[in-house]
A protein has these predicted regions:
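A short, N-terminal "cap"/entry segment at the start of jelly-roll beta-barrel domains
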Residues: 1-40, 48
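Glycine- and acidic-residue-biased ligand/ion/polar-headgroup-sensing regions
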Residues: 34, 54-79
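Short beta-strand segments
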Residues: 37, 81-83, 109
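Conserved short histidine dyad/triad with adjacent acidic residue
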Residues: 38-59, 95
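Short acidic-glycine-tyrosine-enriched beta hairpin
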Residues: 78-96
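Ligand-binding loop in jelly-roll beta-barrel domains
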Residues: 94-120
Length: 121
């Protein structure tokens, strides 16, 4: 059992784990009851190109809850409609297979409160 903790401070400048891949990285900070992730993707990053080979699935099958810090990206459920998430947006994405890619020439940064543990693992 964990000792009672009144406050626990973590910082992405000193993450507990970093998963690096082509055109980006995923940093994790681990708390007793949850893991929070910070995704940083360079322009040109695409899930199906950069993460698919690491995950063994064609598209992302992780459920997400997060917030976009900067830049913008897509969520594509392969059903014809492509959704856009941009700076300031809070997003929920189901585990239904989806692709994603960075839009434009700005780095995309997002924080993940759900699904971080399983991402790019």
């Amino acid at each position: 059992a964990l000792p009672m903790i009144d406050i626990l401070l973590k910082n992405f400048e000193n993450p507990d784990e970093v998963r690096k891949f082509e055109k980006g990285k995923f940093e994790l900070v681990k708390l007793p009851s949850m893991t929070i992730g910070r995704a940083t993707y360079k322009p040109g990053w695409k899930w199906s190109d950069d993460i698919s080979p690491l995950s063994g699935t064609d598209f992302c099958e992780v459920e997400h809850l997060g917030m976009v810090i900067s830049g913008s990206a897509t969520v594509d459920f392969q059903d014809g409609k492509i959704h856009t998430v941009k700076s300031g947006d809070i997003f929920y994405v189901s585990s239904k297979p989806h692709d994603s890619w960075v839009l434009g020439d700005e780095e995309y940064v997002s924080i993940h409160f759900l699904g971080a543990e399983d991402y790019a693992d």
